Amino acid sequence: MTIRDRDPLEVFSNSLVPMVVEQTARGERSFDIFSRLLQERIIFLTGPVYDQVSSLICAQLLYLESVNPTKEISFYINSPGGVVSAGLAIYDTMQYIRCPVSTVCIGQAASMGSLLLAGGEKGHRYALPNARVMVHQPSGGAQGQASDIEIQAREILIIRQRLNEIYREHTGQTLEQIEQKLERDSYLSANEAREFGLIDKVVERNPHETTPDPS
């Protein structure tokens, strides 16, 4: 997908990134807001999960591990989901790095977004009160020769089985319960997501300790 293929409003909105200006001993320094938050070990996933977004988030995770391999990373998710392979790249990187990754759902975590939410550090997976979570089985289309369609259908079934196993690992539900829940689009409130094991706590305030401003 190119920029031309995307919704013009989405492109316009994503280009409006606030800048933060800080005073230092060497003068003023300006950062875009996401770079400034990255300094505080905060990563954002907003919008669909596709390859470019996945690469950026994986790079941020690896960078923060290189800076401090034990300090927690906060991963905020507001996503309708997207490409399975791109989402699994983020998930695998979250599990690969040594840093604990806390996840926070703001707005929505649907499809692959919900898997990333559930894949956070156990005990540190949160959702805001009005967040929505949606889980379902992977979908896809196939075209070409009958043998090619058969191969693609078999691949989707393999992916579905793997996703079910990941959800089972992180929720504590049985495989049968996972399969039943993911059979169709299942929309969950924050409390329902907690009961199902996708998150650990519904929060109204930032669960992380803050450092008082010395000024």
Swiss-Prot record:
Catalysed reactions listed for this entry: Hydrolysis of proteins to small peptides in the presence of ATP and magnesium. alpha-casein is the usual test substrate. In the absence of ATP, only oligopeptides shorter than five residues are hydrolyzed (such as succinyl-Leu-Tyr-|-NHMec, and Leu-Tyr-Leu-|-Tyr-Trp, in which cleavage of the -Tyr-|-Leu- and -Tyr-|-Trp bonds also occurs)
Domain of life, source organism: Bacteria
Protein role: Cleaves peptides in various proteins in a process that requires ATP hydrolysis. Has a chymotrypsin-like activity. Plays a major role in the degradation of misfolded proteins.
Originating organism: Gluconobacter oxydans (strain 621H) (Gluconobacter suboxydans)
Main location (coarse class): cytoplasm
Taxon lineage: Bacteria, Pseudomonadati, Pseudomonadota, Alphaproteobacteria, Acetobacterales
Pfam families: CLP_protease
GO cellular component: cytoplasm; endopeptidase Clp complex
Record-linked InterPro entries: ClpP, ClpP/crotonase-like_dom_sf, ClpP/TepA, ClpP_His_AS, ClpP_Ser_AS
Active site: 111, 136
Family of this protein: Belongs to the peptidase S14 family.
Keywords for the protein's UniProt record, in alphabetical order: Cytoplasm, Hydrolase, Protease, Serine protease
EC number in record: 3.4.21.92
Leader sequence segment: none
Protein name: ATP-dependent Clp protease proteolytic subunit 1
UniProt cross-references to NCBIfam families, sorted A to Z: PRK00277.1, PRK12553.1
GO biological process, one term: protein quality control for misfolded or incompletely synthesized proteins
UniProt xrefs under PROSITE patterns: CLP_PROTEASE_HIS (PS00382), CLP_PROTEASE_SER (PS00381)
Subcellular location: Cytoplasm
Record text on subunit structure and interactions: Fourteen ClpP subunits assemble into 2 heptameric rings which stack back to back to give a disk-like structure with a central cavity, resembling the structure of eukaryotic proteasomes.
Enzyme class: hydrolase
GO molecular function: ATP-dependent peptidase activity; ATPase binding; serine-type endopeptidase activity
UniProt key word Cytoplasm: yes
HAMAP family xref list: ClpP
